[in-house]
Amino acid sequence: MKTDTPSLETPQAARLRRRQLIRQLLERDKTPLAILFMAAVVGTLVGLAAVAFDKGVAWLQNQRMGALVHTADNYPLLLTVAFLCSAVLAMFGYFLVRKYAPEAGGSGIPEIEGALEDQRPVRWWRVLPVKFFGGLGTLGGGMVLGREGPTVQIGGNIGRMVLDIFRLKGDEARHTLLATGAAAGLAAAFNAPLAGILFIIEEMRPQFRYTLISIKAVFIGVIMSTIMYRIFNHEVALIDVGKLSDAPLNTLWLYLILGIIFGIFGPIFNKWVLGMQDLLHRVHGGNITKWVLMGGAIGGLCGLLGFVAPATSGGGFNLIPIATAGNFSMGMLVFIFVARVITTLLCFSSGAPGGIFAPMLALGTVLGTAFGMVAVELFPQYHLEAGTFAIAGMGALLAASIRAPLTGIILVLEMTDNYQLILPMIITGLGATLLAQFTGGKPLYSAILARTLAKQEAEQLARSKAASASENT
């Protein structure tokens, strides 16, 4: 009985099959692979830029404080130098923005959101230097601003720069690299890779085009930027608050109450930001000299506060562990909270190049600590720790203001390394977000973008009317 044996492939047929396979590989569209490779390039560059920005801000702050040491024996002179050093640095930042790249003012995150919707231009050749050096001036001067705004906008513009340099074509490549740079910027600012990914998916969900290629690119960019950050910095939590105790199940209702408080305060805070923008615009009226002088006055005030009451100035990273440890009395916490609300509104609403993430994290920490101290006194049977409410409050104001609870929760967990508090943080963040949504009002970045687009439309209409008038004459 015969059995069929498989025929062996001839050498000629094997060569032909290999040629066909190679031809198919060569003819395949390389765009997805090119995008992923460029995402790694973008993430690397963004990480290096974020590290340089962070080191530059720290160096300027050290130089500014070092200049005050030489005048320590003369108190009036000390206050004068403290005011002038911060005022000059702030004026430098305001001047760069107003003169060369107005779109580099403020956080920059709404600009990236507008660019993802094809509603705002990305002029990386002017935004990159202005945002970098302008942000060095304002943050180095001790203003109440965060570094995440500059790094996100710098990251998005680096994504567009890489796209233009390597001449990648197509909307998918442009959109993906822009989003990748923004996510990498946030991840490098806070050493929080997962928060960077969630920031794009959650905060920029109306603008982000979710595809397999785009999300892979964001992952790759965030990984590379975080690696760059950790090469030049320690691989530890950005904010050291120690390991806090867990929250017992019978105390979780207190975190819901804390979330309700933030849900009420968040929309009010957003209205204050927009109202302060209108007020300060009436002060300078669009005049560059008045605008720079106003910025110098605000920066000088922050410089004075940084010497007289350090907890009320700066981004707030130094304040968070001190407040969480319970080193402030209730009266001092109230003073710090009120003072930082005022300085945050003045600095951010004035159009200074800088973010608002870090100041809001500090505000949430202070308010959460105050709530925790009250809870400790009212419910001694629970054996509460005020620091756990501080951690829960950190992300709650962020959740209520920009309506990104997941980003706020994961960001705080990655920054503090207290993952055991994830359940109370979810409860606080969800309560804050839901109540803020029910009370109405737009998320902060969406409201700022809407204002920017309305102003852009008005300017375009005015130019078209002027052009029509000149043609008629």
UniProtKB/Swiss-Prot annotation:
Site (Mediates proton transfer from the protein to the inner aqueous phase): 203
Effect of residue 445 to A: Abolishes gating, permitting continuous rapid transit of chloride ions
Motif (Selectivity filter part_1): 106-110
Record topology, Cytoplasmic segments: 1-32, 117-123, 167-176, 202-214, 282-287, 439-473
Consequence the record notes for mutating residue 203 to K/R: Decreased proton and chloride transport
Intramembrane segment boundaries: 109-116, 177-189, 193-201, 387-401, 402-404, 405-416, 417-421
Transmembrane segment boundaries: 33-69, 77-100, 124-141, 148-166, 215-232, 253-281, 288-309, 330-349, 355-376, 422-438
Motif (Selectivity filter part_2): 146-150
Induction trigger: By acid-shock conditions.
Top-rank taxon: Bacteria
Catalytic activity annotation: 2 chloride(in) + H(+)(out) = 2 chloride(out) + H(+)(in)
UniProt xrefs under CDD domains: EriC
Chain positions of motif Selectivity filter part_3: 355-359
Keywords: Antiport, Cell inner membrane, Cell membrane, Chloride, Ion transport, Membrane, Stress response, Transmembrane, Transmembrane helix, Transport
Gene3D superfamilies: Clc chloride channel (1.10.3080.10)
Coarse class of the protein's main subcellular location: membrane
UniProt cross-references to Pfam families, sorted A to Z: Voltage_CLC
Membrane topology: Multi-pass membrane protein
Compartment(s): Cell inner membrane
Primary role: Proton-coupled chloride transporter. Functions as antiport system and exchanges two chloride ions for 1 proton. Probably acts as an electrical shunt for an outwardly-directed proton pump that is linked to amino acid decarboxylation, as part of the extreme acid resistance (XAR) response.
HAMAP family: CLC_ClcA
UniProt record similarity statement: Belongs to the chloride channel (TC 2.A.49) family. ClcA subfamily.
Subunit structure: Homodimer.
Name listed for the protein in its UniProt record: H(+)/Cl(-) exchange transporter ClcA
Originating organism: Escherichia coli (strain K12)
Phylogenetic lineage: Bacteria, Pseudomonadati, Pseudomonadota, Gammaproteobacteria, Enterobacterales
UniProt gene name: clcA
